[in-house]
């Protein structure tokens, strides 16, 4: 009985959702397949940055490469199509990662939409952290511009997600991801 009262107290005062559910979007140990990732770097507009997606021996996803500012470049990204999942009611996306101190974006795309919906997060150098990105923080962006008059993100229409770096800092980058989850 004492445990039940403690749980209710914590739930009420610390807003722990009693019906919180998570849905794995990326869990590299589930054999997501490297060949399913698409790389889109600034070479599409004349830049020379490069990136790759790998799976390390711990079965974590590695997004790494080199950002070059040459030819007005400065970004690298990766994208994975996701199978139709029920994302209705999602409150936030959770990423467990170890980074290099750079800023990154989680990008969500909807079918037949030019823009993607992005949310920024900062990694910490050589330290595992969990970042939570609320759905309402995702903004429609295209080619580096944010749009205020674009339709709202519709979770049931998401068909891909990706990782993106565009902080205009030349040099190597390395992001290790254990998982990306959608949390209700």
What kind of feature is each model-predicted range?
Residues 17-184:
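Beta-rich carbohydrate-recognition modules and glycan-binding surfaces
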